[in-house]
Amino acid sequence: MWYNLPHMKPIVVIPTYNERENVAAMAAAVLENLPAGGRLLFLDDNSPDGTGAIIDGLCARDPRIAVLHRVKKEGLGRAYVAGFARALALGATHVVEMDCDFSHDPKDIPRMLAAVADADVVVGSRYVKGGRCVGWPFRRWFVSFFGGRFIR
């Protein structure tokens, strides 16, 4: 597939807060689905459960993983903004955003990167035809779906 070209340097940005149970598995899944020049950037909001320390250990073992430790929890939106800025500073040619709770499937990364060949922006959504919420209880889906509609 074309997404594995040497010039492509995608960075996957993942904010974390109390994700110690997921962070190592998510890192492995993301790295498995990245092309050769890809990297993973975690943004930890000073998680009290030790998520940041786990990420530090992952960084020590794999140079493709980086972390931005933030002093306090400032919200998901600000975490993504900081992550996008850091990804661009690190030389990203493409930025992929994902959550650490596996609500976004890392197996979709190659498909999204391949889609960039025909578009400037690629958006994956669980609310479009063919989209889905795997493993979500009804209450979480309901709040997410109707909360998004209310905000719009």
Model-inferred region functions:
Residues 19-32:
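Short, well-formed alpha-helical segments that are part of the catalytic scaffolds
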Residues 27, 37-47, 68-69, 98:
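Short beta-strand/loop segment that forms part of the nucleotide-sugar
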Residues 19-22, 47, 105:
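Donor nucleotide-sugar binding loop of glycosyltransferases
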Residues 92-103:
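Short beta-strand-to-loop acidic/aromatic patch adjacent to the donor-nucleotide binding site
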